[in-house]
Design a protein with these regions (language model features):
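Contiguous, often N-terminal, cationic amphipathic patches that form binding interfaces
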Residues: 1-41, 48-50, 54-59, 63-79
Length: 79
């Protein structure tokens, strides 16, 4: 599944609004630490391995597109 993700720094939450996931991260956006926290939180939220979550676009942006492998199949949502 593809998800549009909006990142907010300094908070710790996950909220779904329509086809967008808004996620609060406590890590600073330095050297990929925030992206790693994002992958960790989304894998826990969807109950999948970290290898099943990848950032498709927006590596250096607060708005990202993230792909999550669910049930060994990729699906597209909101596109």
């Amino acid at each position: 599944m593809l998800f549009h993700v909006k990142v907010v720094f300094g908070k710790n939450f996950i909220k779904v609004e329509g086809d967008e996931i808004i996620i609060g991260l406590t890590s600073k956006p330095l050297r990929g630490k925030a992206n790693l926290e994002l992958i960790r939180k989304l894998s826990k939220y969807f109950k999948v391995s970290r290898d099943s979550v990848r950032i498709v676009s927006g590596f250096k942006s607060r708005r990202k597109v993230v792909e999550v492998l669910l049930n060994n199949k990729f699906h597209s949502v909101g596109n």
